[in-house]
């Protein structure tokens, strides 16, 4: 079966113009595993005669059940293109398909149902106007049904089709259908959907997919395709204020300067005023340039180069916006975060936050609560696990321009990237800026770090000792502190155990508390360095991310990481505090090296091995290195072995 439409040559231009004027509906299919999402879209395309003959022939070659005798085709294979998907019979990646009918154009995203691939579902839902949520008639509402419904609501999808699938497997019973619809309506009343349209279907056999089925005489509503062709979208979705993220400054010659990018939303015309979001500079559009020539006006989705009437500071990472509807510019905001990674989200840990325009270092300062997707109850939590949703306060290293996600999906979202693996570990939807950021200002001080350092006749530095418990960190740091003090240096030693008696007495030894422990100490060390001191920090600090965060707080060259490398068995043999004995007996939880991991530094400034060396000798070696370092003599490191 193939779809061929005969168009007389003289009508081609009229047909293309009519096609261009059709509205576009972006929708997703979602739900639990094996609810029939891919099969439904395959059936929709097949029965609407929108599948080409070569695609049908290919289904037989990939071994779809029944294809050889022509009686049955596995329509899910039209969407499941990955080899792993076909082998396992599940959807893994997001499959996008474009098709059109006489009434409307469609872009459909077939998203995976397995919990492990929730991140892919979020990707598909982020641009959708409508969600088809499938439910297996035999199983009813499952946890993944609830999760996908909640995420669809969170991502701003306003319209839902509740496709009660496999109705044939329950003998087309109206009671089963109505019970599922009632259960879902009760669940979804808190989600704020503008419309929910229930439809009983059989994706495999085509009941109520393209046309009404004789098997469900008790259902008098529209078939699925008919509803998709006629559902009305919110008009406000088509009228957002102008937003233009600058992707590149075009400077082909001295007489031309243009700002290239894609219009996120809204429209712009030659002569319209615009504002640079971060600086507030005002100007107007002198010309709109494209590859095909200049335009008088341009709108959402178009890639253009804007030539401005004045020279302004609008480099990559900034945004040109409408003067009467400017975005927020702030470095603190509240957001809903969906966590993707197997490693939990840690408040206090430094991540990379990427928006449509910016890429900045960011920290989750507070996890306010986790959202229970079954009951929507707010629950206290210290971290977010994979596929969990939480409300967080986030702080960025520099101000970013954004809108609230509910007002503008294009400029109100972000992703969170792990600094080590560069993997996308989370996605976020901005709720609102935190006004506290506007009320706190830096106060200019007459006496600065340089003045304090000059008075002490030394350069400030932060010597960060890291290693296992019992490695000798504190012993070596204490000996070095004694040597430097004898030389008249102004120092201070921050010891892990001592700090936990005061500043960090409220923290335990869970991974979340360890992250916060190091964050606080790093901030204290920064203040002490600002006072012109040589700061010795002796903490296990087991995670690379937190040591990197501490380094980034300091000025270039100020942070010196010292890896005190002692084998675990030697640390356990020494066991000066009896902690290893307790940990190995199961009496201490989350003990580094035994029941909690230690991430060794990959490229420390100093790597010292303690076995066979006296603490005093190692302290002297560090002192010699420090003398060269803060004295400006940057000779190659002579690491003690």
Swiss-Prot record:
Lineage top rank: taxon? Bacteria
Keyword set for this entry? ATP-binding, GTP-binding, Kinase, Multifunctional enzyme, Nodulation, Nucleotide-binding, Nucleotidyltransferase, Plasmid, Transferase
Q: Which gene encodes it?
A: nodQ
What is the scientific name of the source organism? Rhizobium meliloti (strain 1021)
**Region called G1, residue ranges:** 31-38
Q: Which reaction does it catalyse?
A: sulfate + ATP + H(+) = adenosine 5'-phosphosulfate + diphosphate; adenosine 5'-phosphosulfate + ATP = 3'-phosphoadenylyl sulfate + ADP + H(+)
Q: Where is this region: Sulfate adenylyltransferase?
A: 1-458
Role noted for this protein: Proposed to provide activated sulfate for transfer to Nod factor. ATP sulfurylase may be the GTPase, regulating ATP sulfurylase activity. APS kinase catalyzes the synthesis of activated sulfate.
Q: Which residues form the tr-type G domain?
A: 22-236
- List the HAMAP family hit by this protein, alphabetically: Adenylyl_sulf_kinase (MF_00065), Sulf_adenylyltr_sub1 (MF_00062)
One GO molecular-function annotation for this sequence? adenylylsulfate kinase activity
EC number of this enzyme:
2.7.7.4, 2.7.1.25
How it assembles, according to the record, is: Sulfate-activating enzymes, NodP and NodQ, may be physically associated.
* Residues the record lists as binding GTP: 31-38, 110-114, 165-168
Question: Protein name, please?
Answer: Bifunctional enzyme NodQ
Record keywords: Flavoprotein included? Answer: no
Region feature (G3)? 110-113
Sequence segments annotated as region (Adenylyl-sulfate kinase): 459-641
